[in-house]
Regions:
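N-terminal amphipathic, basic helical "cap/leader" segment at the start of enzyme domains
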Residues: 2-6, 10, 25-172, 176-177, ...
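Extended intrinsically disordered or low-complexity segments
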Residues: 14-15, 339
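Non-catalytic terminal regions with compositionally biased, polar/charged low complexity
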Residues: 17-21, 43
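Short acidic (Asp/Glu) and glycine-rich catalytic loops that position anionic groups and cofactors
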Residues: 18, 33-37, 396-397
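Conserved beta-strand/loop scaffold segments within soluble protein domains that form the structured core
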Residues: 131-133, 137-426, 440-468
Length: 468
């Protein structure tokens, strides 16, 4: 009998191609005040940011490692380089990007996607953006889409100072404090009042450096009555040492505004993905999260929505695929503060080859959140007896005038369904891949076509060789 292939050994093709490490600058490994000072000087931070970084480091050193969730014992910050500057500064014209970096992003389809269906693109390589551009017609609407470094030091400096790490503070948890100390790169977006951005903006993050971390900061403000769809993609080649991603996303959705934030995460399976995402939604505002998590060795990701305004809404649609050697602990959180607020979580988790998938949901309804409604649905698919799937719901309801529900289901692939598809001419492997793709359809149907195709390809890649 042929030995069953392991997901961790599958060739991830374009994602796992490593570039030669030819950095302009690589910070020494570890976390000390001297290293943070050096980073701040390297980036020419304003004084308030220099102080913020050092304060965040102090908080990081004081805070304990979370005592719940997956083990992160394999992550040693003394062996992580927190800043790696590529040899190219940021370009606004694709042809000016160095050829080797350009080749990497072209393999990932970034310039093609920009030409076909995006209003603007930011591409980050290790710790800094190497490309950033927005269409003229979008900029003419007053939409600001730039890198965080330019926003921090340029004409939007006051806005950055007002919003930066106010929603996610360094005291939230240890890795939020780490982010505050060493953040670099990321995107800044401001959509003016009443502006409807009809096609998405996208940022793509690629970590090529071995034994390094990526700590980009994304700050988006969608003003009153405006709307935006923002796409985020992530990948890295696999190494035999730990890499770390501890980015931060802060989203401000103003009165009657709407923001959809879509993510396809395909980190390599030596990655610790400890990301923090949060949205603050004002009266009548809508936040929609669409999330696909396929990579990393350990993943902890729980986008949080604070429904501050009356009649504000949140929707979270997610899929997680945990294969061999993966422990993906994901979910979503919502806090209902305003009256007549509503939240809906609809997730799918898939585990195979001993992978562990955990879904955590947290619903908090404050005392004044009269007539709040919340629905949580989690469905899990285990493809073998070695895998594991857990659901950990938490509810804190402080008013009687609320309707809150939770539903969880765990199952396996029906042999009858596989046999039926095989009778129609499909191989067993293709039949199982098709069933799993259909199970994850809740996310793929919410994505633009190119990204839905990429997600389904990732599922097929993970399923390859799963039949012994």
């Amino acid at each position: 009998m042929k030995e069953k292939s392991q997901v961790a050994d599958i060739d991830r093709s374009v994602y796992d191609i490593r570039d030669k490490e030819d950095d302009a600058y690589r910070m020494q490994e570890g976390l000390t005040p001297e290293i943070i000072d050096k980073l701040s000087k390297e980036k020419d931070d304003p004084v308030w940011m220099q102080q913020f970084r050092l304060q965040s480091l102090q908080i990081y050193n004081e805070m304990p490692v979370p005592d719940w969730g997956p083990s992160i014992e394999g992550l040693d910050m003394d062996h992580i380089a927190t800043y790696v500057r590529p040899k190219s500064d940021m370009k606004n014209d694709w042809k000016d990007v160095p050829q080797d970096i350009k080749d990497t992003f072209e393999r990932l389809g970034i310039p093609q996607a920009e030409r076909k269906s995006l209003a603007g693109v930011g591409a980050q390589y290790d710790s800094e953006l190497v490309y950033h551009n927005v269409r003229d017609e979008v900029a003419a609407q007053g939409v600001v889409y730039t890198d965080m470094e330019s926003a921090l030091k340029g004409e939007y400096a006051d806005m950055v100072h007002k919003y930066f790490m106010k929603l996610v503070t360094p005291r939230d948890h240890k890795f939020a404090a780490l982010h505050g100390a060493v953040w670099s790169g990321g995107s800044f977006v401001y959509v003016p009042k009443g502006v409807q951005v009809s096609i998405p903006l996208q940022s793509y993050f690629r970590l090529n450096a071995k034994g390094a971390g990526q700590f980009e900061h994304t700050l988006i403000i969608v003003d009153e009555g405006a709307s935006l769809h923002f796409l985020e993609g992530c990948s890295a080649p696999k190494y035999n040492v730990a890499n770390l991603h501890a980015g931060c996303v802060e989203l401000y959705v103003k009165k009657n505004a709407k923001l959809r934030y879509s993510t396809i995460e395909n980190w390599s399976k030596n990655m610790y993905n400890l990301n923090t995402k949060r949205a603050l939604v004002e009266e009548g505002g809508v936040i929609e999260w669409v999330s696909g998590s396929f990579g990393s060795h350990v993943g902890c990701l729980y986008p949080m929505s604070v429904l501050k305004g009356d009649n504000s809404k949140m929707e979270f649609t997610g899929v997680t695929f945990a294969g061999a050697g993966q422990n993906l602990d994901t979910g979503a959180k919502v806090v209902h503060i305003g009256r007549n607020t509503s939240s809906y979580m609809n997730t799918r988790s898939i585990s195979k080859s001993g992978g562990i998938s955990t879904f955590r949901s947290s619903v908090v309804v404050q005392k004044g959140a009269k007539h709040a409604k919340s629905s949580v649905s989690c469905q899990s698919l285990m493809l073998d007896s070695e895998s594991r799937s857990d659901t950990v719901p938490a509810m804190d309801i402080r008013t009687k005038d609320a309707a809150v529900g939770h539903e969880a289901k765990i199952g396996s692939i029906s042999n009858e369904a596989v046999f039926y598809l095989m009778s129609r001419g499909m191989s067993e492997e293709d039949a199982r891949a098709l069933i799993v793709s259909g199970f994850a359809d809740n996310v793929s149907k919410e994505l633009p076509l190119e990204y839905a195709v990429e997600m389904n390809n990732l599922i097929r890649l993970e399923m390859k060789g799963s039949i012994g």
